[in-house]
Amino acid sequence: MPQTESLPEDIRLHHAVPILRVNNLATTLDYYTRILGFKIAWEMPWYASVRRGTCSLMFCVQGQGHAGTWIWAPVSDVDALYEEWKASGANILQGPTNFPWESREIQVLDPDNHRLRFAADLKPGEPMGTFID
């Protein structure tokens, strides 16, 4: 296996796009578009993708992926996102909370019990929150 130092400089990883297993694609797409504000990037009868900003997720009906997957994604303003999603009726597990890894996060549960953690950088001097795991 090659050492990291020997890889060419022009090979760069950009971002990962998780594939989440879902039971009902229509229900999932409705939640992500109507409640969470994502847009459908493309859709097939058993497979689809949504996008919001540079965050993309894929959904597969009863195929790829596993139930109860956890996703972590950075966001520019976690407090504004929390207020938006609270107003739209999102299933919020934890409001904005500060963590020792210098992150302020919210946690949302989707219809297939996937836990979505969205985070922004912690502001200096803010106190830490409590884990709910």
Over which residues does each language-model region extend?
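Conserved short beta-strand elements that form part of the metal-binding/catalytic scaffold
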Residues: 2, 39-70, 115-120
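Short, basic/aromatic recognition patches
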Residues: 93-97
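Conserved acetyl-CoA-binding loop of GNAT-fold acetyltransferases
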Residues: 35-40, 89-91
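Vicinal oxygen chelate
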Residues: 15-23, 49-51, 62-88, 104-109
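N-terminal beta-strand motif that seeds the catalytic metal site of vicinal oxygen chelate
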Residues: 1-29, 56, 69-71, 120-133
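C-terminal structural segments of small proteins and small subunits
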Residues: 101-102, 119-121
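Conserved active-site tyrosine of GNAT-family acetyltransferases
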Residues: 28-33, 85, 110-113
